């Protein structure tokens, strides 16, 4: 094979690699930077989360999944934890989560961090009390750091 053909072949292979890599990391595997402390201590400010854009079906979302949402109000992506699914009634009372009347232990929350944070910020509640019923097209998300 002539030198010119080798250069052309190499250039085409390199171009194909660049094209596949670009498509993969802009349309299929999307890196998202965590901005702020709202998911601490599970995720830290500036951590990178990888999103598989091919599996972004809303019906695949499960309770307590960590999700990336496009926040139009802030004009950026946000990382949060799914607490409520369509139709759920959520109640937080005295730092306890009830979903449709059933108590759920939020095992993903760091109990030591919560105890220290309550002392540091001189508060009795880590999650403010509330009650909400979701519509059939809504999910409810919270960060893991609720102070």
Model-derived regions, located:
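Hydrophobic membrane-insertion alpha-helices, especially the h-region
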Residues: 9-27
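Soluble "head" domains of membrane/secretory-pathway proteins
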Residues: 2-8, 23, 30-33, 40-147
